[in-house]
Curated annotation (Swiss-Prot):
Disulfide bonds: none
Membrane-spanning parts: none
Homology family: Belongs to the UPF0352 family.
Coiled coil regions, renumbered to chain: none
Pfam families (alphabetical): DUF1414
Identification of the protein by name: UPF0352 protein swp_2271
Length: 72
């Protein structure tokens, strides 16, 4: 999603691979997978992002997600 990241491609790809493996293990259909991942995002935003930054971080995340879907 990000043009520049403080994380290596290896770190990102490893995490993605593990997350997708869990969804596959549970034979999760696309809608359930998106619901679960969305709930994970909500949990992270509510518990790991300071309240005063949540709106901006949420907007940045949504914009990056939208752009990544358009560019694929």
């Amino acid at each position: 999603m990000a043009i520049q990241s403080k994380y290596s491609n290896t770190q990102v790809e490893s995490l993605i691979t593990e997350l997708l493996a869990v969804l596959e293990k549970h034979q999760s259909p696309t809608d359930l997978s998106l619901m679960a991942l969305g709930n994970c995002v909500t949990h992270l935003l509510q518990n790991k992002v300071p309240a005063e930054a949540r709106e901006v971080v949420t907007e940045q995340f949504a914009k990056a997600l939208s752009q990544s879907v358009k560019n694929s």
